[in-house]
């Protein structure tokens, strides 16, 4: 009865949770680029992040002759030349940031500079290039598809103006009225301002900010299909850069030899897709954590930790109080308990005989009851069993499970289980609908079930710890309890593993018509959470060691005393 | 945006066995009353959001402890990380009222150096005919320890909300006044998620102004 209630509660809370990741991830995006955040019409968080990341990537690639993502042949073949080029590039980069010598730089640029000095220079000199490319390309890519021609024209014009006159950047000036935002953007770039300005020509910088302005103000859209516009801007930029810096000319030639900008952008987009997929799974991971917490898994883990720590200090202080001889004896006992805990892995393999998936749920329930009975602790596995049953039930659509067939269970417990099943009925009625579950639903259910079952496993271990410590009339030797606990933990871990396998199977079935890039992250994430789940359970089990040691000390002392 | 809460308060519910701690919490968190309830083993957990002012939510994490004497030594270990507590007695059970003093003494020893804001709860007030503790004497005892007193019934849902929300408000006030602070290594009060969108737009406005002048 408690369980059903907890469930409802948790479900109620879930709505809140789903909201979290988006608001959580916001700050991060903002760090990357204030400009996008500021633009009058904010774009959805994700695409924005993408574009930026994309652009940053692109910027790095476009700027550097031999970035990690690129074929190493360029580096290998012309390493000496490359070194030079890199140096030049670096000079260019630093130059683009430190504007002290810039006579015609307008206020925003100065401001930029001031702020840049304040901002930490993370990532060394290369970061300069990254951010340089970012400020240009992020804004550029953000506008693609929306007023492309305008962008082209404006960028082209600015570039022309600029190459004619290295000092003033009128374009930037005029755009400042509504273009203030991206100044902040540039200002927050983590550019290495403290690196000394090497080459005097600061022209590229002024031009750049002009482009940034021009590009940014023109519109807002995501990077789709506007590659040629970007390419245009990129080429123009390269030319201008090359004109004012002979070193960069070499960079440019090198770049032209290797890949075209559009190709690189496409690659970057692919990378971005992958990153996005990963990002999604990260958000979902957070989701698991929240659910795990909502099912009070964290609280039970924390409480178990409290008990474990307290027991540990009890053991230590008791050992400290003993004389040599007794100490050795007790130490021996405690170590043998510890050894049993360490032997878990072996047991794990022994027990892994695969059974039919359908039987497993019931099998597990009876095994759980049996093991707890063997432990001589009055812990009832109702909650865990119910969670397991629920998990198995939804994943085996159509297959109606027989009521839990627990062999060694007392009649009372049977009654209890029956009682508790009642509130669940309305959910079971919905079974027909469940056959129409979408991949996302299956995915969410999988994560939720893993979170719930894991939380219940940890609750169970916590309860065992509490009962082992206090409340037993007739204690079973700690060594024996340890052996049973291993079996219990192994059973739990196996069950969780088999559940996550079931869930991925179900995902594969339901999502057979989905593309791999949609389905795979979900499957990976379920497998990952399944792994995490078993780790949680296993960690919780390890927390029981001091508890059993204390229990051993208590019983052996009781024996010794009379 | 339900998930946005200002703080999380950890509350502990203590009192003699069978005074109705779990039932009170279940009424509060699940909105229903269980006729039959198993004795709590060690500690159990519940949580609920409480809106103390419009838009200001506090997440309550409630630790439901076992009242049975045999679990006392474990439940003690859980006191330390709570900011607030409900100390229950059964108005139809004089003994449980007499033990209130003992409970307070015990928690005092085990929460140091922290403090718990307690409210004294006279439970099962629906059973007024079987009352063994008068409201007056309960109020007197509560006042002696600087606690508020409230009578509740989980079965009839009397004052259940009020007991929790009043306590939450009191703690919130103390937190606001800085008399209770969030501390490293103490779980009693935790800061929640606060949207920081406003913050970033403020920055924007600032830099814009500077740019234009």
Swiss-Prot record, chain B:
Distribution of this protein across tissues and organs: Highly expressed in the brain.
Residues reported to bind Mg(2+): 22, 40, 64
BP GO terms, sorted: autophagy; protein transport; Rab protein signal transduction; regulation of autophagy; synapse organization; vesicle-mediated transport
SUPFAM superfamilies, per database record: P-loop containing nucleoside triphosphate hydrolases
Record text on subunit structure and interactions: Interacts (GDP-bound) with C9orf72; C9orf72 in complex with SMCR8 acts as a GEF for RAB39B. Interacts (in GTP-bound form) with PICK1 (via PDZ domain); a PICK1 homodimer may allow simultaneous association of RAB39B and GRIA2 to PICK1 which is involved in GRIA2 trafficking. Interacts with isoform c of RASSF1; the interaction is strong. Interacts with isoform a of RASSF1; the interaction is weak. Interacts with the DLG4/PSD-95. Interacts (GTP-bound) with HOPS complex components VPS39 and VPS41.
UniProt function note: The small GTPases Rab are key regulators of intracellular membrane trafficking, from the formation of transport vesicles to their fusion with membranes. Rabs cycle between an inactive GDP-bound form and an active GTP-bound form that is able to recruit to membranes different sets of downstream effectors directly responsible for vesicle formation, movement, tethering and fusion. RAB39B is involved in autophagy and may function in autophagosome formation.
Name of the featured protein: Ras-related protein Rab-39B
């Amino acid at each position: 009865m408690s369980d059903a209630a907890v469930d409802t509660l948790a479900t109620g809370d879930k709505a809140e949770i789903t909201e979290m990741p988006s608001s959580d991830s916001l700050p991060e995006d903002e760090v990357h680029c204030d400009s996008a955040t500021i633009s009058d019409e904010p774009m959805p968080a994700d695409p924005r992040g993408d574009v930026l990341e994309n652009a940053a990537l692109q910027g790095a690639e476009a700027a550097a002759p031999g970035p990690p993502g690129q074929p190493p042949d360029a580096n290998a073949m012309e390493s000496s030349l490359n070194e030079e080029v890199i140096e030049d590039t670096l000079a260019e980069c630093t130059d683009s940031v430190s504007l002290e010598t810039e006579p015609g730089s307008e206020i925003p640029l100065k401001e930029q500079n001031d702020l840049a000095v304040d901002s930490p220079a993370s990532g060394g000199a290369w970061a300069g290039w990254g951010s340089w490319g970012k400020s240009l390309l992020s804004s550029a890519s953000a506008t693609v598809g929306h007023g492309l021609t305008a962008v082209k024209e404006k960028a082209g014009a600015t570039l022309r103006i600029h190459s004619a006159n290295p000092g003033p950047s009128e374009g930037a000036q005029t755009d400042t009225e509504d273009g203030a935002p991206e100044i902040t953007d540039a200002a927050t770039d983590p550019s290495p301002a403290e690196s000394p300005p090497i080459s005097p020509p600061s022209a590229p910088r002024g031009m750049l900010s002009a482009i940034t302005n021009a590009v940014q103000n023109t519109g807002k859209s995501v990077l789709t299909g506007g590659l040629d516009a970007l390419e245009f801007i990129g080429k123009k930029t390269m030319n201008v850069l090359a004109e004012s810096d002979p070193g960069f000319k070499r960079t440019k030639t090198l770049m032209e030899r290797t890949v075209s900008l559009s190709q690189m952008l496409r690659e970057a987009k692919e990378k971005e897709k992958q990153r996005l997929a990963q990002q999604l799974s990260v958000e979902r991971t957070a989701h698991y954590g929240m659910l795990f917490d909502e099912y009070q898994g964290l609280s039970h883990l924390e409480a178990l930790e409290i008990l474990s720590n307290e027991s540990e200090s009890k053991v230590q202080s008791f050992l400290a109080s003993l004389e040599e001889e007794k100490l050795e004896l007790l130490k021996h006992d405690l170590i043998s308990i510890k050894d049993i805990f360490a032997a878990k892995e072996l047991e794990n393999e022994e027990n892994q005989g695969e059974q039919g998936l359908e039987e497993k749920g019931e099998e597990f329930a009876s095994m759980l009851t049996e093991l707890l009975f063997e432990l001589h602790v009055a812990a009832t596995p109702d909650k865990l069993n119910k969670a397991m049953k629920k998990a198995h039930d939804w994943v085996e659509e159509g297959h109606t499970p027989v009521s839990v067939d627990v062999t060694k269970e007392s009649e009372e417990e049977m009654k209890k289980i029956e009682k508790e099943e009642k509130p669940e009925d309305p959910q079971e009625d919905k079974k027909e609908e469940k056959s129409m579950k979408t991949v996302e639903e299956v995915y969410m259910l999988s994560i939720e079930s893993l979170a719930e079952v894991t939380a219940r496993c940890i609750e169970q271990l916590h309860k065992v710890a509490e009962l082992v410590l206090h409340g037993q009339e007739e204690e079973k030797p700690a060594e024996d309890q340890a052996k049973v606990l291993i079996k219990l933990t192994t059973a739990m871990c196996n069950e969780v593993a088999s559940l996550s396998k079931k869930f991925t199977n179900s995902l594969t079935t339901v999502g057979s018509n989905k593309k791999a890039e949609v389905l795979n992250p979900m499957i990976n994430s379920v497998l990952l959470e399944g792994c995490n789940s078993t780790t949680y359970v296993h960690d919780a089990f390890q927390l029981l060691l001091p508890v059993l040691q204390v229990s051993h000390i208590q019983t052996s002392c009781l024996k010794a005393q009379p | 945006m339900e998930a946005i809460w200002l703080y999380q308060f950890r509350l502990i519910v203590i009192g003699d066995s069978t005074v109705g701690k779990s039932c009170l919490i279940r009424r509060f968190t699940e909105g229903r009353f269980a006729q039959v309830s198993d004795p709590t083993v060690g500690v159990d957990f519940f949580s609920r959001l409480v809106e103390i002012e419009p838009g200001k939510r506090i997440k309550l994490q409630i630790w439901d402890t076992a009242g049975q004497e045999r679990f006392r030594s474990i439940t003690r270990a859980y006191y330390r990380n709570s900011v607030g507590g409900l100390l229950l007695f059964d108005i139809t059970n004089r003994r449980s009222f007499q033990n209130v003093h003992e409970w307070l003494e015990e928690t005092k020893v085990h929460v140091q150096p922290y403090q718990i804001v307690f409210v004294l709860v006279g439970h099962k007030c629906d059973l007024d005919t079987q009352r063994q503790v008068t409201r007056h004497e309960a109020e007197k005892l509560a006042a002696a320890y600087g606690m508020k007193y409230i009578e509740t019934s989980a079965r009839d849902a009397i004052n259940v909300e009020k007991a929790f929300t009043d306590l939450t408000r009191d703690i919130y006030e103390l937190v606001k006044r800085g008399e209770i602070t969030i501390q490293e290594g103490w779980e009693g009060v935790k800061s929640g998620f606060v949207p920081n969108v406003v913050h970033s737009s403020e920055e924007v406005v600032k830099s814009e102004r500077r740019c234009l002048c």
